[in-house]
């Protein structure tokens, strides 16, 4: 029976209806230029739609976040800071102390901000070990909080992180902070890491923009962990120059971590536009926050008035 069916299919008359239908279609299209034009327009529109969808940047979402809130022993009310400074006249004179108090009153800094234990010593401990201890304290607390809050979107926990971006305003250590996070949480071997330092307070915004750019072109479901921090242990200035006393007053211990994704599933917010204006080409802006050495002491931050404009 199979041989008979095959022979019947090979018979010329068996293909006549198909050929006839194809010929009628071609004849119909050829005989009507309008139909040909419409078919071409439809095909072009479909091709353009497919290309635009393939090249369109993906939306990026904030899944959740966590912050270092500090423990009661890290809090430093104004009265405590003032008393501590008065006990170190060999580092801070009365005129400099009055200047810092006036600046503190105008800054709006609350009574529950924190400083590291290294700055409670007399004189303060500004060594590398103190900076490492502070980094581990604030970074791990922020990341723990972010991963715990984002747990519903991370079935495997930290193993679901595909990219890591870490920034610290001025302090640089070895190994870098990104490697510190990778080692602590056992991130995958193929995780993409970026470590930024020396970009000042804008480092946090730069991290978010960098992670957003990465997620916009990554496959769906990609997740990034962004961590930003500021370390005070190595930034304390023991002197009387007012422009260098500003960081002693304005900066406090802290860190923040956010989990970002290009999938809206379980996300809390959609990331909007990230805008950054770079004015480092102007000397005034370039030197608004400068790291300098004071004698044999470690590097301190010189912040002029331009940084507040």
Spans of features found by a protein language model:
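Conserved catalytic cysteine-centered active-site region
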Residues: 16-23, 107, 112-114, 118, ...
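Terminal signal-anchor or tail-anchor transmembrane helices
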Residues: 1-57
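Hydrophobic pocket-lining "lid/loop/helix" segments that shape and contact the acyl-thioester
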Residues: 54-85, 90-152, 156, 229-309
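Structural beta-sheet core signal
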Residues: 166, 225-226
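Active-site nucleophile and cofactor-binding loops and adjacent substrate-binding regions
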Residues: 33-38, 164, 193-204, 248-251
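Folded extracytoplasmic luminal domains of secretory or organellar precursors
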Residues: 142, 146, 163, 170-171, ...
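A generic local secondary-structure boundary/capping motif
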Residues: 50-51, 212-216, 244-249
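Short glycine-rich phosphate-binding loop at a beta-alpha junction
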Residues: 157-167
């Amino acid at each position: 029976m199979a041989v008979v069916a095959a022979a019947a299919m090979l018979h010329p008359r068996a293909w006549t209806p198909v050929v006839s239908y194809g010929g009628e279609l071609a004849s119909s299209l050829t005989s009507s230029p309008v139909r040909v034009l419409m078919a071409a327009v439809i095909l072009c529109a479909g091709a353009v739609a497919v290309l635009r969808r393939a090249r369109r940047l993906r939306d990026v979402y904030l899944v959740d976040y966590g912050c270092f809130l500090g423990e009661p022993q890290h809090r430093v009310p104004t009265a405590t800071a003032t008393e501590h400074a008065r006990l170190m006249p060999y580092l801070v004179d009365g005129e400099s102390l009055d200047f810092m108090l006036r600046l503190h009153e105008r800054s709006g800094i609350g009574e529950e901000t924190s400083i590291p234990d290294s700055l409670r010593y007399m004189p303060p401990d500004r060594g590398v070990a103190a900076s490492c201890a502070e980094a581990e304290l604030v970074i791990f607390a922020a990341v723990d909080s972010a991963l715990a809050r984002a747990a519903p979107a991370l079935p495997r926990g930290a193993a679901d992180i595909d990219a890591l971006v870490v920034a610290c305003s001025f302090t640089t250590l070895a190994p870098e902070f990104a490697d510190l996070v990778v080692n602590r949480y056992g991130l995958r071997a193929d995780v993409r890491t970026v470590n930024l330092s020396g970009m000042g307070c804008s480092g946090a915004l730069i991290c978010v923009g960098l992670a957003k750019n990465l997620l916009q072109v990554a496959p769906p479901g990609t997740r990034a962990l962004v961590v930003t921090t500021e370390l005070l242990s190595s930034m304390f200035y023991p002197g009387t120059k007012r422009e260098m006393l500003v960081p002693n007053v304005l900066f406090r211990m802290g860190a923040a971590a956010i989990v970002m994704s290009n999938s809206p599933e379980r996300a809390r917010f959609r990331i909007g536009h990230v805008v950054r204006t770079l004015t480092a080409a102007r000397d005034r802006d370039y030197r608004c926050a400068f790291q300098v050495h004071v004698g044999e002491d470690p590097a301190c931050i010189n912040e002029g008035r331009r940084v507040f404009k």
